[in-house]
Amino acid sequence: MAILKWKLQRSTVREVSIAEPTTYTPAQTTAPTVSACTTEDGVSAPPRKRARGPSTNNTLCVANIRSVDSTINNIVTDNYNKHQRRNNCHSAATPIVQLQGDSNCLKCFRYRLNDKYKHLFELASSTWHWASPEAPHKNAIVTLTYSSEEQRQQFLNSVKIPPTIRHKVGFMSLHLL
């Protein structure tokens, strides 16, 4: 009989207060009731969410504004050579190739490059995207760095880049902190 009473007591549903903590006194024998805002129909209304909108804090912090690249990025063509080269007299720029395309295709291609052509480049970035809504494309980008322009040219001559991946040649100044 005691087991039956215990099972009956455990199987009954009790109302619990969610909106505010309830304190019990030894004299209380009834279960606490739910206290929440109710509408005319007796349905409890959910709590109101915080209104989102533009920030009212319009403080503009301008400190230490300077160019990301501290060098002059002119491309110079001389009369004797028909190819374009960069004026690197005062910069620590490294030659790069940016690969653009579907992120999964770029990841697979980067894996193949690390497996077969590791000697033809220095570093390969992870896939990344421009985070602006005005970004010119939604494709992923992988950046490859080279120790010299000759190494980059050797890479471009010997590696077949898939037609689904576009590439751009350029320079990047790397200032390590």
From Swiss-Prot:
Single Gene Ontology BP annotation: regulation of DNA replication
Subcellular location per the Swiss-Prot or TrEMBL entry: Host nucleus
Region Disordered: start-end pairs: 29-57
InterPro entries membership: E2/EBNA1_C_sf, Nucleotide-bd_a/b_plait_sf, Papillomavirus_E2_C
Stored Pfam families: PPV_E2_C
KW Glycoprotein (keyword) present: no
GO MF annotations, alphabetized: DNA binding; DNA-binding transcription factor activity
Major localization listed first in the record, in broad terms: host cell
Keywords on record: Host nucleus
Top-level taxonomic group: Viruses
Any one GO CC term of the record: host cell nucleus
Biological role stated in the UniProt entry: Plays a role in limiting the replication of viral DNA in keratinocytes. Recruits the host NCoR/SMRT complex to viral replication foci to mediate repression of both viral replication and transcription.
Family: Belongs to the papillomaviridae E8^E2C protein family.
Protein known as: Protein E8^E2C
Organism of origin: Human papillomavirus 11
